[in-house]
Amino acid sequence: MKLHLLKSKIHNAIVTSGDLEYEGSITVDSELLKKADMIPNEKVLVVNNNNGERFETYIIKGDHGSRVIQLNGAAARCALPGDEIIIMTFCEIEAEEAPDFKPMVLIVDKNNNPKRRHRIGEEDEQLG
């Protein structure tokens, strides 16, 4: 049996902009993607901490070091610049692997600078 588990998340990111005219997606700084073990085109679940909205989209790679978190297309209606969000990816693994699986958590500050990261159940790695 396969289980659908959290793979990684960027916690408390701040939306920097939105583009309603774009076809859809979320643009994320490529440095943050790498630190969070996420890749372009990966499906994400996004939670808006300001209003409780949840929506799915996919990742577009933003410029390295830009700290961009931009919602595009219809997703731009789900959160406004300045809103705090959580960006999550998921994976399927065999049930017997689940007890040892440890998702990656990247915590960012109010300017989307990486502060620390850890695998759930392990110690933080300080980043900034």
UniProtKB/Swiss-Prot annotation:
Q: Which cofactor does it need?
A: pyruvate
Which Gene Ontology cellular-component terms appear in the entry? cytosol
| Assigned EC number | 4.1.1.11
Cofactor binding note of this UniProt entry:
Binds 1 pyruvoyl group covalently per subunit.
Task: List, in alphabetical order, the GO biological process terms annotated in this UniProt record.
Answer: alanine biosynthetic process; pantothenate biosynthetic process
Q: Which InterPro entries match?
A: Asp_de-COase-like_dom_sf, Asp_decarbox
Entry's CDD domains? Answer: Asp_decarbox (cd06919)
The highest taxon in the source lineage is Bacteria
Lyase among the record's keywords? yes
Q: Name one Pfam family in it.
A: Asp_decarbox
Catalysed reaction equations from the record: L-aspartate + H(+) = beta-alanine + CO2
Location comes to: Cytoplasm
* Post-translational modification, as annotated: Is synthesized initially as an inactive proenzyme, which is activated by self-cleavage at a specific serine bond to produce a beta-subunit with a hydroxyl group at its C-terminus and an alpha-subunit with a pyruvoyl group at its N-terminus.
Which is an annotated GO molecular function term of this record? Answer: aspartate 1-decarboxylase activity
- Pathway, per Swiss-Prot/TrEMBL? Cofactor biosynthesis; (R)-pantothenate biosynthesis; beta-alanine from L-aspartate: step 1/1
Which UniProt key words apply to this protein? Autocatalytic cleavage, Cytoplasm, Decarboxylase, Lyase, Pantothenate biosynthesis, Pyruvate, Schiff base, Zymogen
Pyruvic acid (Ser)-modified residues are where? 25
**Which residues are responsible for catalysis?**
25, 58
| Chief location | cytoplasm
Q: Residues that bind substrate, according to the entry?
A: 57, 73-75
Q: How does it assemble?
A: Heterooctamer of four alpha and four beta subunits.
Extract the HAMAP family matched here: PanD (MF_00446)
Q: What does this protein do?
A: Catalyzes the pyruvoyl-dependent decarboxylation of aspartate to produce beta-alanine.
Question: Which family does the similarity line name?
Answer: Belongs to the PanD family.
- This chain belongs to the protein called Aspartate 1-decarboxylase
